């Protein structure tokens, strides 16, 4: 009996140990880990993460405990992780490793060279696959950089180098420009060249982007109109997003004007939405209202939330009758698309400001009815009805 109990306890102990296993992250700084790598020959696996990142949390709690994952990473790497919510660490490493999203996994050798970089949330098998790829010199950044630098006009060398950089979301524009220059700024219109440009060009204000735009029809023949226009849209979005978010209006309007020259409706729609955000952030209400009046019907007519937002801004910041009428039209359209409480309330408010009492009453009543369906507080709509005499 005692022997059976002992065996049972041993089984539970082994099982607990198995489930508790995970990647063994060493309590080392990156600098000390690199020194250790130089001594042992094991590369460093540096995980840059944020403790509030859900993708990071999922990797830590669900992927790292996988036996296949932990066995491989513990056997082949010196593993460390650093929380980029620590502002000192963030300042030190974000620019150095071009960190733009988390988690990012960086493989570094004992000479402090970045060998490989990969980004995001992975399933266990794919995470091990990335680790195996990182250990093969043929897939490493230094190998592919040297091959490209030896023959910068070669499309295969360029593509392979870009592929290694793209895995880690590293900068690629300079590679595209070097390839373009090495080919005397005249690229053949081939699938391989489109693939290279599509994965590398990111600057609207670059000679190579202007070349792509000038030869849009030629590239559409080897790719497709949809793919080419999608690339132009993503490039515009990339260039507008950062200055708009940081409120760098000088660079925003510089890139905005370049984006407008592309002449694609999907980019014009993006420009309108971003313009409105920038104008609102800077309380430039005349510019906001003018942009909304000239573009909302064309680009946002099926976007209920945007139309309601515009209507609310017009209600708050305009007393011009024709502008208020326009704002009311946006609110009504919003309520048609989504007959929700706040959309109807927007229409009721702006009609009340215009003195169109019957219409204000109608939309206030509709707002109350929709609000009651969801047990919402309808006090604002009730107040409008009271002021209109019920």
Where is each model-derived feature located?
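Bacterial Sec-dependent N-terminal signal peptides
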Residues: 1-24
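Solvent-exposed loop/turn segments at secondary-structure junctions
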Residues: 50-54, 84-88, 112-113, 121-124
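Polar low-complexity intrinsically disordered regions
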Residues: 21-30, 39-40, 44, 88, ...
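Thiol-based oxidoreductase modules, predominantly thioredoxin-like and allied folds used
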Residues: 23-28, 66-89
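Non-catalytic, surface beta->alpha helical segment in thiol-disulfide oxidoreductase systems
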Residues: 100-140
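Local sequence-structure signature of Cys/Sec-based thiol-disulfide redox active-site neighborhoods
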Residues: 27-67
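Loop/turn elements at helix/coil->beta-strand transitions in domains of secreted/extracellular proteins
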Residues: 40-44, 75-78, 102, 110-113
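Oxidative protein folding and maturation machinery
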Residues: 148-390
């Amino acid at each position: 009996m005692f022997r059976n109990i002992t065996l049972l306890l041993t089984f539970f102990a082994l099982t607990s140990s198995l489930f508790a296993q995970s990647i063994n992250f060493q309590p080392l700084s990156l600098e000390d880990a690199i020194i250790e790598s130089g001594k042992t020959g094991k590369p460093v696996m540096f995980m840059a993460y944020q403790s509030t990142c859900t993708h990071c949390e999922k990797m830590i709690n669900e992927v790292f405990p996988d036996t296949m994952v932990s066995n491989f990473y513990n056997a082949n790497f010196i593993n460390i992780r650093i929380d980029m919510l620590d502002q000192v660490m963030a300042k030190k490493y974000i620019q150095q490793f071009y960190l733009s999203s988390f988690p990012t996994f960086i493989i570094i050798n004992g000479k402090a060279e970045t060998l490989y970089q990969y980004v995001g949330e992975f399933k266990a098998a794919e995470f091990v696959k990335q680790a195996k790829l990182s250990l093969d010199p043929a897939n490493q950044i230094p190998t592919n950089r040297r091959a490209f630098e030896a023959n910068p006009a070669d499309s295969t060398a360029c593509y392979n180098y870009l592929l290694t950089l793209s895995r880690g979301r590293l900068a690629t524009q300079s590679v595209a420009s070097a390839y373009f220059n090495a080919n005397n700024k005249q690229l053949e219109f081939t699938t391989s060249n489109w693939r290279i440009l599509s994965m590398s060009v990111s600057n609207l204000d670059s000679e190579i982007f202007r070349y792509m735009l000038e030869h849009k029809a030629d590239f559409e023949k080897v790719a497709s109109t949809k793919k080419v226009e999608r690339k132009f849209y993503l490039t515009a979005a990339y260039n507008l997003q950062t200055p708009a978010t940081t409120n760098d209006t000088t660079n925003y309007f510089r890139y905005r004007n370049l984006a407008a020259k592309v002449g694609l409706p999907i980019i014009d729609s993006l420009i309108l939405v971003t313009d409105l955000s920038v104008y609102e952030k800077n309380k430039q209400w005349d510019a906001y209202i003018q942009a909304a009046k000239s573009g909302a019907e064309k680009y946002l007519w099926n976007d209920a939330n945007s139309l309601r937002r515009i209507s609310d801004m017009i209600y708050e910041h305009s007393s011009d009758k024709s502008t208020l009428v326009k704002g009311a039209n946006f609110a009504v359209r919003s309520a048609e698309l989504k007959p929700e409480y706040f959309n109807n309330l927007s229409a009721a408010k702006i009609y009340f400001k215009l003195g169109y009492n019957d219409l204000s009453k109608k939309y206030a009543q509709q707002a109350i009815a929709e609000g009651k369906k969801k047990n919402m507080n309808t006090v604002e709509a009730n107040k409008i009805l009271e002021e209109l005499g019920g």
